[in-house]
Amino acid sequence: MDEKIRIKDIAERAGVSVGTVDRVLHKRPNVSQKAREKVEKALAEMDYQPNMYASALAYNKAYTFYLLMPKHESEAYWEEIEEGAMKACELMRDFQINVKIMYYKRFDTPSFIKKYTECLDSAPDGVIIVPAELETTRQFTDKLHQHNIPFVLLDSNMPDLRPLSFYGQDSFSSGSFAAKVLMLVASNEQEIMLMKQMKDGKVVSKQQENREVGFRHYMHDHFPHIKITELNLPLEYERKNYDEILEDFFTSHPQLHHCITLNSKAHIVGSFLLHTNRRDVQIMGYDMVGKNVECLKQGSISFLIAQHAYMQGYSCVDTLFRAIVLKKEVEPVNYMPIELLLKENVDFYRRTQL
């Protein structure tokens, strides 16, 4: 019905008092089963939809959501997530939504545990988590479940943890897409390089692991003859060490022209290629990080895949708001668009598009 339905109208249809309707709508006690059924029948017949926004405003309760994410230094992907989250907070200020950001040191389990302990001690209404390793994150989410605190996962999907919702790319599809795009320019090659950044011999991001599965699956099915040579640039190394490793690699692989990384650090290789004047080699990577964009425009990076980080940050806060404040159902899995950036279109990328 287009007309506004009043409590008085519902009471007349159900043949009960206005007070009875009010108690049913707000799930209060002291209503007989017969009266409740009459009211519920009237609500269904009149297609009544409660004004959840008005109810939330009238409730006049403040809510605090925590965003637990890696500490970073001017890294565009994480900055955009923060900006999106804080924009959502700003737009919901009438509902007294407060978002607090807590930073943990990347790839540092004790740091993650310390921060999630502080988060739990603060008794938040909801939490947004950029996951660490699976079992470490599980320790946190198990405690959230124990305290009935809803949480949303951002960036990496771990469905076994039973989150309220997830926002990020479909990592397998993203990796497969990356392989398909790379082969548009490298299908005649005999060998390509896959650059990784590892710690203690393993990739620390579940998202990157899943991207690699998708990448290799596509390559195996469509270009099995192309050799994939891995190059590790250890996370704990400094830039000068990377340059030494890269110089040795490209000197010993003079016929290799195309590389890819499934993380946001394509600029490490891209910058090296520029300052060593290797104009016949390119790398493909992820994320519209400032240094990546510079290399993309100068030609050492061939393509970038964007993840709509701003949208992720905004949507995570909005999902907690809708689930906790408005008591609405939310989508459990929300995959971000897989967007391809070239030097010709990178300046038109709308990072804040919602």
Tell where the protein language model's regions lie, with residue ranges.
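Hydrophobic alpha-helical segments within soluble ligand-binding/sensing domains
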Residues: F166-M193, Y242, H308-V325
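Flexible loop/hinge segments that line or gate small-molecule binding clefts
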Residues: T136-S173, V289-K297
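Hinge/cleft segment of the Venus flytrap/periplasmic-binding protein
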Residues: A42, M46, K202-V203, M219, ...
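Hydrophobic alpha-helical
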Residues: V127-H145, T229-K291
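N-terminal helix-turn-helix DNA-binding module of bacterial transcription factors
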Residues: M1-N60
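Hinge/beta->alpha junction and helix N-cap segments in small-molecule ligand-binding domains
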Residues: P70-E79, K100-S111, G168-S174, K196-G214, ...
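Short helix-capping segments at alpha-helix termini
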Residues: L91-F95, H147, M219-K227, L274-D280
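Amphipathic helical "hinge" segments at domain boundaries
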Residues: N51-P110
